Amino acid sequence: MSLRIVFLGSPTFAVLPLERLVADSRYQVVGVVTQPDRPAGRGKMPVATPVKQAALRLGLPVLTPETLRDPAAVADLADLRPDVGVVAAYGEILRRDVLAIPPLGYVNIHPSLLPLYRGPSPVAGAILNGDAETGVTIMVIEAKMDAGPILAQRVVPLPPDARTGSLTRELFAIGADMLLETLDAYATGAITPHPQDHARATFTKLLSREDGIIDWSQPALRIERMTRAYDPWPGATTTWRGAPLKIIAARVRSDRHSDAPPGTLLDTAEGLAVATGDGLLVLETVQPAGKRPLPAADWRRGVRLTGGERLGG
């Protein structure tokens, strides 16, 4: 008899785990819970989440409550009679009344090696800190965020050029593979959840636009990591002549220094660079406001820089 699953997820990278569950005869996805349609694009027309679009394509029942704090939404979820819930970036912390619905609780795909990087921005956190490795954790959800016992983990090398968007997709693809075997083993009692070492826990926060604003007095290494950690959101941003400028890609020259104030644009043999608090940051790709990304050299030729101009000033 197939295990009855309710799937909770919203963004693009949560679609693959859903598709893999539907394709596996051991599991029966009895319903999908995702965020409501939100206005998007220039016309601000309501747009369904990628998970909702996938669920409709797969012929699955879909619930889109504004919040699972709504008693009616909780009742609708209970009516699905799931044995277990699977969560992949749903977008809301589950309360105890929701957690109590499936007899086996909820299993979550978390893109870090818990207890490290609990919270909403684990991939960005690992990149920003320059970690050599990251990973995926399959865990049982408890009321406290990302603190539940662990079912499985896999270590994944963190390349020095990793960006949050692409790495998140990779980690959730790995998580989808892990989920299929872990879920069956958990349901049959073949594996036992083991508690996290809470003393080792580290935490991340929901990123805001302000997090992406570059402080040029920081080291070049830190700023370069920002360009990758904050891709696609919120981006590593500064201003030039009063207008926003996003730094898409750059490289660090920690062996090169300048007496110019942080943020000063410098022509170097390696290209357009910026003075920082420690080392030079050579710009590779930038995006002016309202325009597409372009090579920094092309931007440099088009804007007619004058000597001593500064970013962020």
Swiss-Prot record:
Enzyme nomenclature, EC number: 2.1.2.9
Spans traversing the lipid bilayer: none
Reactions it catalyzes: L-methionyl-tRNA(fMet) + (6R)-10-formyltetrahydrofolate = N-formyl-L-methionyl-tRNA(fMet) + (6S)-5,6,7,8-tetrahydrofolate + H(+)
Xref: InterPro entries: Fmt, Formyl_trans_C, Formyl_transf_N, Formyl_transf_N_sf, Formyl_transferase-like_C_sf, Met-tRNA-FMT_C, Met-tRNA-FMT_N
UniProt superkingdom: Bacteria
GO MF annotations in UniProt: methionyl-tRNA formyltransferase activity
Residues that hold (6S)-5,6,7,8-tetrahydrofolate according to the record: 112-115
Keywords on record: Protein biosynthesis, Transferase
Keyword Transferase in record: yes
GO cellular component, one term: cytosol
HAMAP family, sorted: Formyl_trans
Its job: Attaches a formyl group to the free amino group of methionyl-tRNA(fMet). The formyl group appears to play a dual role in the initiator identity of N-formylmethionyl-tRNA by promoting its recognition by IF2 and preventing the misappropriation of this tRNA by the elongation apparatus.
Family per record: Belongs to the Fmt family.
Protein name: Methionyl-tRNA formyltransferase
Protein encoded by which gene: fmt
